[in-house]
Amino acid sequence: MAATAAQAVAVKGSVAVPPCGSRGRRRGAVASVRMAAAAATSALRIGRRSPFLGRRLAVGPRRSRPVPRNLVAPVQMNLAFAKATKWWEKGLQPNMREVESAQDLVDSLTNAGDNLVIVDFFSPGCGGCRALHPKICQIAEQNPDVLFLQVNYEEHKSMCYSLHVHVLPFFRFYRGAQGRLCSFSCTNATIKKFRDALAKHKPDRCSLGPTRGLEESELLALAANKDLQFNYTKKPELVPSGDAAAAQELDRGSTKLSPPAKPLVKQGSEERSLVSSGR
């Protein structure tokens, strides 16, 4: 009976506890049982509150965290600053400016008087124009009395067609009553052509007539271009008055010698008498 009682197990709750042994072991077993029961109860409560109870959890690709606004702002400012900086606006001198319209070009040439004016036709996408731009700015700085007008081909393409500009970079020199002095195309490698033309036409000259500017054929072509808001009326041809016409005729007669009078021969007489203008 004693052996049977020793082998018997007393059931308390749902845990089997041997009837014999130290009390410390019994207390430890009871404590572990209580802790396991408390953990199970806590897990059950959390499971009831969780929205994923009894559902499948889909795991997708990892998403990057949004960047704070204070970090994005400097990047946007740098990009905006880079877009605003244009190569043809760098290094400009006080005597350099960009033409805004056909009327602006005509007025600028007319109001320049006897000063030398250089019209620079360029394009933002032209590599030769970009390479030549720093040297043109340097030349403009060395010649403050020369006016440099820049014409953007991309913004004034229709006007350039009317002015027969089909190659870039392209330059035209104008001065006073002489109008257009020369026109040519040059690159960074042929900058000597530009310097030679500047040295030839830079010396001051006094015009005796009004400032000419563009040719009349070019003005008519600009006026006929429907894409441009430019008006021009052909100047009437001046008819010389009577005194002016007589003076012009006298000038022509003084330069040309009149041929001598031919002798006249009387027919029907035996003697042939020569009648001259002096007899």
From Swiss-Prot:
InterPro entries: Thioredoxin-like_sf (IPR036249), Thioredoxin_domain (IPR013766). Its main location: plastid. Residues 61-203 form the Thioredoxin domain. Signal peptide: none annotated. Residues 242-279 are annotated as: Disordered. Keywords: Chloroplast, Disulfide bond, Electron transport, Plastid, Redox-active center, Transit peptide, Transport. Disulfide bonds join C126-C129. CDD domains: TRX_family. It is found in: Plastid, Chloroplast. The active site is at C126, C129. One of its GO terms (cellular component) is chloroplast. The keyword Transit peptide applies. The keyword Transmembrane does not apply. Pfam families: Thioredoxin (PF00085). GO terms for biological process: cell redox homeostasis. It comes from the Eukaryota. Residues 1-34 form a transit peptide. Probable thiol-disulfide oxidoreductase that may participate in various redox reactions. Belongs to the thioredoxin family. This is Thioredoxin-like 1-2, chloroplastic. It comes from Oryza sativa subsp. japonica.
